[in-house]
Amino acid sequence: MEQKSYVIIDETGIHARPATMLVQTASKFDSDIQLEYNGKKVNLKSIMGVMSLGVGKDAEITIYADGSDETDAIEAITDILSKEGLTK
């Protein structure tokens, strides 16, 4: 299992557009991928799960990936978070 933590810097947090990009990216991988915020974990392949967390600015999140392509999954998600301006 791999994990990585991030701090969200976008003023609006993880809103619909970047959430969709994260879900689409996570869905490309076979690994089980979860997002944790405030002690609650959701499936990163579920848009409803991601949106239900209400992740705002300055929030600390952790992404967990477990499976055969876990390293690639974490790298791809890190790229999306950066490209979408959610993290530094």
UniProtKB/Swiss-Prot annotation:
Active site: 15 (pros-phosphohistidine intermediate)
Localisation per UniProt entry: Cytoplasm
UniProt GO cellular component terms: cytoplasm
Chief localisation class: cytoplasm
Modified residues (Phosphoserine): 46
GO BP annotations listed: phosphoenolpyruvate-dependent sugar phosphotransferase system
Keyword Transport appears in the UniProt entry: yes
Family matches, as PANTHER family: PHOSPHOCARRIER PROTEIN HPR (PTHR33705), PHOSPHOCARRIER PROTEIN NPR (PTHR33705:SF2)
Family membership: Belongs to the HPr family.
Name of this protein: Phosphocarrier protein HPr
Species the sequence originates in: Staphylococcus xylosus
Gene that encodes it: ptsH
